[in-house]
A protein has these predicted regions:
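Non-heme Fe(II) oxygenase catalytic core, chiefly the N-lobe of the double-stranded beta-helix
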Residues: 1-244, 250-286
Length: 286
């Protein structure tokens, strides 16, 4: 079956049909999916089997994979895949007040080499919620007032793991804190593949804008965060079992919705292909 592409009527996203999870993707089909991801920032592939090996192979086609910072999330077969679950009937999930990921963030923005893409596969879906919100940060940047764009172009921001999870993130112990020191990234990121600019700050991990007074930094970030969460920039993805969703992490933010009453929501997550040529990124702070 030929690959089909249907863009979503949303700020991001396209559904890709014709993918057979029982077979390896041809180079032609993979490059088609890759181009759709670059163009639409989110790719939804429905009706795939729960095949860990296939999912890992798909992720590896995009580049190296990065294990989750917390080993307790690692899949029992491989650290390259994580199990992100929220069973609110269990003590495990109650380590955090909210389900994991229930805050706006960009995966690994707290690392020297942020993630290029994440891949989420649904195995358990509540019937009454548990959606994922995704914001198009290219459109967010382009819609900023010109005066504000002039202020932030060329500035950098400091990112820290655990900074702003608001009850949906496990605070790192001293060993993890030493392993992941604060990092600096440009406030406006240039996409290495497309050259498009996007806003690269997020409430989950961005501490401050550098080179400006603290109160001014806080005011700018509050304005940028509020702007990025406006409805016209966001897509709300409703999960179905067997869906694989690829997200271009370089130009989006995302968050899980903690709005469901049923106990279980479970996704398999692959985080991958950390580039080492992000313009302006990577100065470690000690």
């Amino acid at each position: 079956m030929a690959i089909g592409v249907e863009p979503l009527d949303a700020p991001v996203g396209a559904v890709v049909s014709g993918v057979d999870g029982r077979r390896s993707l041809s180079d032609r089909d993979f490059h088609r999916i890759e181009q759709v991801l670059l163009e639409h920032l989110v790719v939804v592939i429905p009706d795939l089997e729960d095949d860990v090996a296939w999912l890992l192979k798909f992720g590896h086609r995009f580049g190296p994979l990065v294990p989750h910072i917390l080993t307790r999330f690692h899949h029992p077969k491989t650290p390259e895949m994580s199990i992100i679950s929220a069973n609110m009937d269990s003590g495990e999930s109650r380590r955090t007040v909210k389900p994991a990921g229930a805050f706006w963030h960009s995966d690994l923005s707290y690392c020297r080499d942020p993630s290029d893409a994440i891949f989420l596969y649904a195995t358990h879906v509540p019937s009454d919620g548990g959606d994922t919100l995704i914001a198009n940060m290219q459109r967010v940047y382009e819609a900023l007032p010109e005066s504000l764009r002039k202020v932030i172009d060329g500035l950098t921001a400091t990112h820290r793991y655990g900074w702003g999870g608001k009850g949906a993130i496990t605070a790192p112990d001293p060993q993890r804190r030493a392993q992941y020191p604060d990092v600096v990234h440009p406030v406006v990121r240039v996409h290495a593949r497309t050259g498009r600019r996007s806003l690269f700050v997020n409430p989950g991990y961005t501490m401050c804008i550098n080179g400006v007074p603290g109160d001014e930094s806080e005011a700018i970030l509050e304005e940028l965060f509020a702007h990025s969460q406006r409805e016209e920039f966001c897509y709300r993805h409703r999960w179905a079992v067997g869906q694989l969703v690829a997200i271009d992490n370089r130009a989006t933010l995302h968050r899980a919705m903690a709005d469901y009453r049923e106990p279980m929501r479970k996704l398999r997550m692959i985080v991958g292909c950390a580039e080492r040529d992000t313009p302006g990124a990577g100065n470690l702070l000690n």
